[in-house]
Amino acid sequence: MGARKRISAEARKEAQKTMYFAKLNNVPTSPRKMRLVADMIRGMEVFRALGVLKFSNKEAAARVEKLLRSAIANWEQKNERKAEAGELCVSSISVDCATTLKRMRPAPQGRGYRIRKRSNHVTLFVDTLSKNDSQN
């Protein structure tokens, strides 16, 4: 490995140590429906976000709640202590399209209508709240 490549790899590795995230792949929910739930908690303090997700009536909220609990556990594992209230926030959450299953539905006059069963990938990052962010 070259010197410049090694330096950039070490920098990436150091940056990875301070990132706390969880990924959820191939969720059988349409990305549009999942983004509604993701927009509800983006930038929120994690325990407040858990409360919002718990009382949301959307099906995707239960999946995102489980993902958020996993991200909090990842943070606790790396820092070797429990997260306190007001310490962590959802720094970013992204919902990307995954594979789409294509099915046919019988239609009049021998035709077939296409049914697209969409799925998505969700990536959630948590980060510590800094002093200036706590004013919000």
Curated annotation (Swiss-Prot):
Keyword entries, A-Z: Ribonucleoprotein, Ribosomal protein, RNA-binding, rRNA-binding
UniProt-listed Pfam families: Ribosomal_L22 (PF00237)
CDD domains: Ribosomal_L22 (cd00336)
SUPFAM superfamilies, per the entry: Ribosomal protein L22 (SSF54843)
Gene3D superfamilies in UniProt: Ribosomal protein L22/L17 (3.90.470.10)
GO cellular component, one term: cytosolic large ribosomal subunit
A single GO BP: translation
MF annotations from Gene Ontology: rRNA binding; structural constituent of ribosome
Record HAMAP family: Ribosomal_uL22_B (MF_01331_B)
Function noted in UniProt: This protein binds specifically to 23S rRNA; its binding is stimulated by other ribosomal proteins, e.g. L4, L17, and L20. It is important during the early stages of 50S assembly. It makes multiple contacts with different domains of the 23S rRNA in the assembled 50S subunit and ribosome.
Family, per entry: Belongs to the universal ribosomal protein uL22 family.
Subunit structure: Part of the 50S ribosomal subunit.
Protein name: Large ribosomal subunit protein uL22
